Amino acid sequence: MHAQFRMPVMPDAAGLAIAEAEEVVRRAAEREEARARRKARNADRQRCRQEERGRNGADQRERQRAEQERLREEAEKARAVLAERAAELREKCGGSVPGCFAAVPDPRGRRGRRHSLPSVLTLVLMAVLRGRTTLAGITAWIAHAGQDLLAAAGARTGAGGRRQPPSGRTVTRLLGMVGARALAEAVACYLAAGQDPEPPAYPLAGPALQPHLACDGKEARGAVRPDGTSLFLLSAATGGIVVADREIPAKTNEIPEIGPMLLELNDRFPLAGWVLTADALHTQRGFAALACENLGAHYVLTVKGNQPGLHAALAGLCWAGARRHRTRDKGHGRRETRSHLVMDAPGEIKALFPHAAQVARVIRTRTVTSWKSNGKKRTRVTETSTETVYLVTSLTAREAGPEHIAAYIRGHWSVENEVHYVRDVTLREDASKIRAGSRPRALATLRNLTAGLIRQSGHDDIAATIRDTEYDNDLLYALLRITPDL
């Protein structure tokens, strides 16, 4: 017998439709439930973020209040320490330039001294103040100096009561023997005491300019050490006056020398609250830590290729919302526009560089107009160049705005005109061929002292003042802060 064949039972259309509808409803309910759970999680996260921001904001306000109190206390301490140290320096230096030189140890033995070291150095400085730039010119001027000038310098009294100038050989020998570093420290100490800087005011009312110290190195091209290497000096200047300098050894550079120089300067007057600027060579984590942690100061530093990671991070930032400041200069056939964009340092920059609070981008556009001739006619030529520079600073937006950052940048580059140009051109340092012993460094120090004395006396034109001293003894005495016996 054949097995009985049965047809499979097929669900009816109505049952399928109901099942599909139930599945759709179930899935929709699951999606709605998942959406509700996500919404609840997002709400919880948002609430947590708000609570965290509130706690962070309260913590930040508390930290700001503590920082304000700390800075206020430091400013009060700085005022007291500054007044005390200024009084000590004035007492030590005697108030006059010969008193400053009296603090320099005499390298000669006690026997056979005919001319005191302060009198010889004062006469050399007089010659420099009267425009003598070579060793031959200095010794010739001293040999023919009048009795009143010799007496004012403290030269020895010879037979018949006449003042005797030191010989050219004595002057040359002493300049080669004197401790160049001791002389530089005494001069820097004296200029720092005369500068009498005010302690920085804490900018409670808003951003404001603070005292500025520019650090920059210079090669004395004409001066050569006994080993044949050039003389390099690292200087710290404020207001065109060198208040600290340090010789760079032949087998190193400025980086390991700037820290000891600033620490020594800090012993003369506190640098807390000052703004330190330096070129891109010193854009180092160690320098930033030294400025902010050891000195209590701030920094404004240029970022270039020696910090590739930091430079790339700054170049990759979005500057659309940055605060802006623009300056324009015109003169000598040149127009220069500088656009400064400043904003708070993001977290990635703070992770790369210590104490970074703000970052800046400066776009310099320079247009130079000149005339060129082909022998028949002159043609006016205009050339335009653009340069982009990045900077990092420890100054917060509360302490410095874009206009203040711009002022610190310009103030740093003014060292070229106020210090280096004066020494190179007016005092002819690059043309000097003095090479033996400590003479190059000693005369470089006396050139710094010359410019510093003139500026501290209220004269801005160094060259004109030097010309005037040639015919005005009273002006010379005033610059040296001495009162001659009449």
What are these regions (language model features)?
Residues 407-486:
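Basic, amphipathic alpha-helical segments enriched in Lys/Arg and hydrophobic/aromatic residues
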Residues 224-273:
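Electropositive, glycine- and tryptophan-enriched low-complexity nucleic-acid-binding patches
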Residues 109-120, 379-385, 434-442:
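Structural motif
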Residues 259-304:
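Domain-level cores of phosphate- or acyl-group-handling catalytic modules
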Residues 2-16, 31-35, 301-410:
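An anionic, glycine-rich sequence signature occurring as long contiguous blocks
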Residues 1-214, 235, 239-246, 267, ...:
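Dynamic "connector" segments at or just before major functional cores
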Residues 224-227, 286-290, 311-315:
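Short acidic, glycine/serine/threonine-rich loops at helix termini
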